[in-house]
Amino acid sequence: MKLNELKPNEGSRRNRKRVGRGTSSGYGKTAGRGQKGQLARTGGKTRLGFEGGQMPLFRRMPKRGFKNVNRKEYAIINLNDLNRFDDGSEVTIDTLKSSGLVKKELAGVKLLANGELKVKLTVKVNKVSEAAKKAVEAAGGTVEVI
């Protein structure tokens, strides 16, 4: 067997339907577009969401809310994520990035109280929840908001 002798399996490939190539093909003359009208013309499609002149659904629905351009998004770190660090070590944004806990460059890092902290740490983050601060201090560590 040679490379030039390779053929696809029978029935696995189908020939493309070539329209407008003579009346005996079954798809000659109008090429499956019907008679006259918008859809028989080139470029004869309606825009997305067009409902024939009826008020489209997206305009019938009421507007809701807005996008706050000043919103800051923080990378979320939970207490159980901090258990991987050594006892007594200092946790900064740089150490969180190098350990892979923070991947995106956002407005900062926020510490939340999900899970249980078992090691004593000095945590330096941009924001911290009240419960997370109490949990870090209960474990013997400190929290510094930078």
From Swiss-Prot:
The Gly residues compositionally biased stretches are: 23-35
Gene Ontology terms describing biological process: translation
User: Region (Disordered) spans which residues?
Assistant: 1-54
Instruction: Give the SUPFAM superfamilies listed for this entry.
Output: Ribosomal proteins L15p and L18e
**Is the Ribosomal protein keyword given for this protein?**
yes
Q: Sorted alphabetically, which keywords does the UniProt record give?
A: Ribonucleoprotein, Ribosomal protein, RNA-binding, rRNA-binding
A single GO molecular function term of this UniProt record: structural constituent of ribosome
List the GO terms this entry assigns under cellular component, sorted alphabetically: cytosolic large ribosomal subunit
- Does the UniProt entry include the keyword Glycoprotein? no
Q: Which regions are flagged for Basic and acidic residues bias? A: 1-13
* Protein family (similarity comment): Belongs to the universal ribosomal protein uL15 family.
What the protein does? Answer: Binds to the 23S rRNA.
Per UniProt, subunit arrangement is: Part of the 50S ribosomal subunit.
Q: What is this protein called?
A: Large ribosomal subunit protein uL15
| Gene expressing this chain | rplO
